[in-house]
From Swiss-Prot:
Residues 1-203 are annotated as: Precorrin-2 dehydrogenase /sirohydrochlorin ferrochelatase. This is Siroheme synthase. The modification Phosphoserine is found at S128. Its EC number is 2.1.1.107, 1.3.1.76, 4.99.1.4. The active site is at D248, K270. S-adenosyl-L-methionine binds at P225, G302, G303, D304, I307, T332, A333, M384, G413. Then it catalyzes the NAD-dependent ring dehydrogenation of precorrin-2 to yield sirohydrochlorin. Finally, it catalyzes the ferrochelation of sirohydrochlorin to yield siroheme. GO terms for molecular function: NAD binding; precorrin-2 dehydrogenase activity; sirohydrochlorin ferrochelatase activity; uroporphyrin-III C-methyltransferase activity.
């Protein structure tokens, strides 16, 4: 270990920053956040630093660096663009046995400022010992994505109640269990939802109870269409906290690979030919069963759970059975697939509205407004439509939509195997058959679909042509 990590208490202690530019200003802001007594020395200051000096938040020393600026200083930061000045600061600090940092110059520094993830009172510092600062920044970005901004509030809440937690849970095992509940349960969820008063009340109520109720909870998570990079930070956190994951058939293996390794994974996806209502009833029962067993359950759905995902039905069931829940939205297939195909869903020249439509209706009724769907200057995004392509095109054309209207079929959208097949609405079913298009695939109908030919950037793009009659007969 080349450098020894330290966390310094700078509250009220003098720190000198030599330099008056933008880099110096960034260092000053960090030091002020740590409540340091900051002095800034330079021939001239940026407007930001000058304002801080005028407000009395820093003390300005105007002119060229002098060693006596170091009087009573605990630390010094050199942030000028002149290496000779920086070296003079470093030498003067070393002579006085004061730790010094020269920005972006490890050779002249006796301490380094790490990349920081601030969730005060929790702080994470990352250093590459000056060897690879870009790598340290990359790691910081990854760590930032793992820790919600509510984590600081949660740590502060736990610290405030620590004496009472110790009093009410004197047994070490019970106390650890309570902290697990506090950090992973509904109190943390309320803080993530920016509801601190309710979180405080819930913690107070829990402390009054003789023991934890052991109740679990359900998080309804939208997994997006497949690319794990499209997961939200909240979705990633939920996957890492889950005890059990009930996932749909269309959730990609790459997304599941990001989940907590020891979480139970239960496939509950519906398959063609199954009784979907019976399958949904089984999912409802599993959600309640696992939650009542005290588990943290993630219900993982492709796309967004509230866009043709029956998420509303599941929440109604959970509410009726007294199970706590929260919802993490996902990027729905229409948005992601269109973007990955280079298709803008709206365009000032072609489409002023977008309609998301399911082609998988109840078997006993067709409730779609075909006349409304056939209007021009709008984009239609059909979900679950691969088995209904002939009907979709025929009804749109019958209700007035031109057979020359462009379409795009996006198969396995956002995944490495993505294909986009485009053509004319009149040829939709025939083109899909000739290219062997299979689910999962999203159908986009409208003038904007024609832009995929020029704007596509990901995966394969195939320009569909209606097969010749002989080919169709074969």
């Amino acid at each position: 270990m080349k450098l020894f990590p330290l966390f310094a208490d700078l509250q009220g202690r003098r720190v000198l920053v030599v330099g008056g530019g933008e880099i110096a200003a960034r260092k000053v802001q960090l030091l002020l956040e740590a409540s340091a007594d900051v002095r800034v020395g330079a021939p001239a200051l940026t407007p930001e630093l000058a304002l801080l000096a005028a407000q009395g938040r820093i003390h300005a020393l105007q002119g060229e660096f002098r060693p006596d600026w170091l009087d009573d200083a605990w630390l010094v930061v050199a942030a000028t663009d002149d290496r000779a000045v920086n070296a003079a600061v470093s030498q003067a600090a070393q002579a006085r046995r004061i730790f010094s940092n020269v920005v972006d110059d490890a050779e002249l520094s006796s301490f380094q400022v790490p990349s920081i993830v601030d969730r005060s009172p929790l702080v994470v510092a990352i250093s590459s010992s000056g060897v690879a600062p870009v790598l340290a920044r990359r790691l910081r970005e990854k760590v930032e994505s793992l820790f919600d901004h509510s984590l600081g509030a949660l740590a502060a809440l736990a610290a405030r109640h620590r004496p009472r937690i110790r009093e009410r849970r004197p047994d070490l095992k019970q106390r650890r269990k309570f902290y697990d509940w506090l950090l992973d349960g509904p109190v943390a969820a309320l803080l993530r939802q920016q509801r601190p008063e309710e979180a405080e009340r819930l913690l107070e109520t829990a402390l009054q109870a003789p023991q934890d109720d052991g109740a679990g909870s359900v998080v309804l998570v939208g997994a997006g269409p497949g690319d794990p990079g499209l997961l939200t930070l909240k979705a990633l956190r939920a996957l890492n906290e889950a005890d059990v994951i009930l996932y749909d058939r269309l959730v990609s293996p790459a997304v599941l690979a990001l989940a907590r390794r020891d979480a139970d994974r239960v496939a509950v996806g519906k398959r063609p030919g199954e009784d979907h209502d019976a399958t949904q009833a089984r999912i409802h029962a599993l959600l309640v069963e696992h939650a009542r067993a005290g588990r943290r359950v993630v219900r993982l759905k492709g796309g967004d759970a509230f866009i043709f995902g029956r998420g509303g039905e599941e929440l109604e069931y959970l509410r009726a059975h007294g199970v706590r829940y929260e919802v993490v939205p996902g990027i729905t297939a229409a948005l992601a697939c269109a973007a990955y195909a280079g298709i803008p869903l709206t365009h000032r020249d072609h489409a002023q509205s977008v309609r998301l439509v399911t082609a998988h209706c109840r078997e006993d009724e067709d409730t779609l407004d075909w006349a409304g769907l056939a209007r021009e200057h709008q984009t239609l995004a059909f979900y679950m439509g691969v088995g209904q392509l002939e009907t979709l095109s025929a009804r749109l054309i019958a209700h007035g939509r031109s057979g020359a209207t462009p379409f795009a079929l996006i198969e396995n959208g956002s995944r490495p195997e993505q294909r986009v097949v485009s053509g004319r609405l009149a040829d939709l079913a025939a083109v899909a058959r000739s290219h062997g298009v299979r689910a999962p695939a999203l159908l986009i109908v409208g003038e904007v679909a024609g832009l995929a030919r020029e704007l596509h950037w990901f995966g394969a793009h195939l320009e569909g042509q209606r097969p010749a009659p002989a080919a169709l007969a074969a």
